[in-house]
Amino acid sequence: MNLAEICDNAKKGREYALLGNYDSSMVYYQGVMQQIQRHCQSVRDPAIKGKWQQVRQELLEEYEQVKSIVSTLESFKIDKPPDFPVSCQDEPFRDPAVWPPPVPAEHRAPPQIRRPNREVRPLRKEMAGVGARGPVGRAHPISKSEKPSTSRDKDYRARGRDDKGRKNMQDGASDGEMPKFDGAGYDKDLVEALERDIVSRNPSIHWDDIADLEEAKKLLREAVVLPMWMPDFFKGIRRPWKGVLMVGPPGTGKTMLAKAVATECGTTFFNVSSSTLTSKYRGESEKLVRLLFEMARFYAPTTIFIDEIDSICSRRGTSDEHEASRRVKSELLIQMDGVGGALENDDPSKMVMVLAATNFPWDIDEALRRRLEKRIYIPLPTAKGRAELLKINLREVELDPDIQLEDIAEKIEGYSGADITNVCRDASLMAMRRRINGLSPEEIRALSKEELQMPVTKGDFELALKKIAKSVSAADLEKYEKWMVEFGSA
């Protein structure tokens, strides 16, 4: 007799009982008790035989408990006579593996749309522009004989009244309230996600917060800001640019420039990335692109900033391109052309400007490159720009009187704006690191604020420069300059 098999069967019986599989558990309990009984017949030692009998008795008690649980569960399944007779027609047989048919909904008119109510008249007047195409709502209850309208009909009617409904909402909105986007025809969750995660009104970034980049600021003012200030001038051949592409190494301030543009223009700022316009459901990504541009037109004047646009609209026709990615690119290109077409017949002050930034301009699709008419280069900061950036980053930090920011600016040549910010942050922490060196956690907590507010010295910057190297190589800069010579449009 294999003792390991007895132990394994007893273990499985207990595990099945714990998992609720009582039928299998009872089978294993019965088998292991028979095995123990046969094993006891072959044992000659009375002491060992008594122990096996004790084990069999314990397993028998467990078996009786499982059997009691099964009988209790079976008692719940006993059919009790109903209080009232039920015919076979009332309760037809239902296959548990098949979903039951939906319960028919009773269509009733909401109580707030009754004729005596005078408060809903402004809403009905607001929708009067849609009444020429057909009835949108019903004032009387829908009878059961009438066929309810399908979701496809509602979608067509909603899309047909999108532009008029939104224009009426903009005209009827009070001065103190921000008009709300009417997402009729779209999933409510998609609209709320874009409103919550993308829309950023009046970012508090100004031109003075950005060091250097005077040429880029001048070009952005001409391409984006001036059409807002002089709408009568920018008409016809002087129409505003459809899009602006900012090209440059990482950390040079492209996102900061986009936020400054939105602040100076007083526009609604949409910050879009590849995750924003991506959905696992077929066709949802294209709807998100279209919804984004419709919301941008509604909240116009609007700045749509697409960061890392090469991840959304890379070159088409490659072997590793997916069908869904191609559809998203096509919808984005169509909507960008649609923005320009809408501006020609609309108020120039209601423009939608597309700002894009990329670190890989050579991967962008040719059609998108054509739509982004202004392509400007955001270079590394100059010596003057590095000194200004040091002043901006260290304006809240106490500096040693002997420190010369111009000397430090010469040492960080080739550093990007993000690299310089990291150097300033690391240097400002050096004094704190020296102060808490060797102290226990209790002593660190007991330190006063004045003890930690020590000035930053030149030696702190030297230590920080030894630890932090520049992140942009000369070969990368040469690639950007070569691309700008071939495709730049500054």
Swiss-Prot record:
It catalyses: n ATP + n H2O + a microtubule = n ADP + n phosphate + (n+1) alpha/beta tubulin heterodimers. The modification N-acetylmethionine is found at M1. Keywords: Acetylation, ATP-binding, Cytoplasm, Cytoskeleton, Isomerase, Microtubule, Nucleotide-binding, Phosphoprotein. InterPro entries: AAA+_ATPase, AAA_lid_3, ATPase_AAA_core, ATPase_AAA_CS, KATNA1, KATNA1_MIT, Katnal1_chordates, KTNA1_AAA_dom. Expressed in testis, restricted to Sertoli cells (at protein level). One of its GO terms (molecular function) is microtubule severing ATPase activity. It is found in: Cytoplasm, Cytoskeleton; Cytoplasm; Cytoplasm, Cytoskeleton, Spindle pole; Cytoplasm, Cytoskeleton, Spindle. The modification Phosphoserine is found at S174. Residues 128-139 have a biased composition (Low complexity). ATP binds at G248, P249, P250, G251, T252, G253, K254, T255. Pfam families: AAA, AAA_lid_3, KATNA1_MIT, Vps4_C. Residues 116-127, 143-169 have a biased composition (Basic and acidic residues). It is an enzyme of class 5 (isomerase). Residues 95-184 are annotated as: Disordered. GO terms for cellular component: centrosome; cytoplasm; cytosol; katanin complex; microtubule; microtubule cytoskeleton; mitochondrion; mitotic spindle. CDD domains: Kp60-NTD (cd21748), RecA-like_KTNA1 (cd19522). Interacts with KATNB1 and KATNBL1. HAMAP family: Katanin_p60_A1, Katanin_p60_AL1. Regulates microtubule dynamics in Sertoli cells, a process that is essential for spermiogenesis and male fertility. Severs microtubules in an ATP-dependent manner, promoting rapid reorganization of cellular microtubule arrays. Has microtubule-severing activity in vitro. PANTHER family: AAA DOMAIN-CONTAINING, KATANIN P60 ATPASE-CONTAINING SUBUNIT A-LIKE 1. Belongs to the AAA ATPase family. Katanin p60 subunit A1 subfamily. A-like 1 sub-subfamily. This is Katanin p60 ATPase-containing subunit A-like 1.
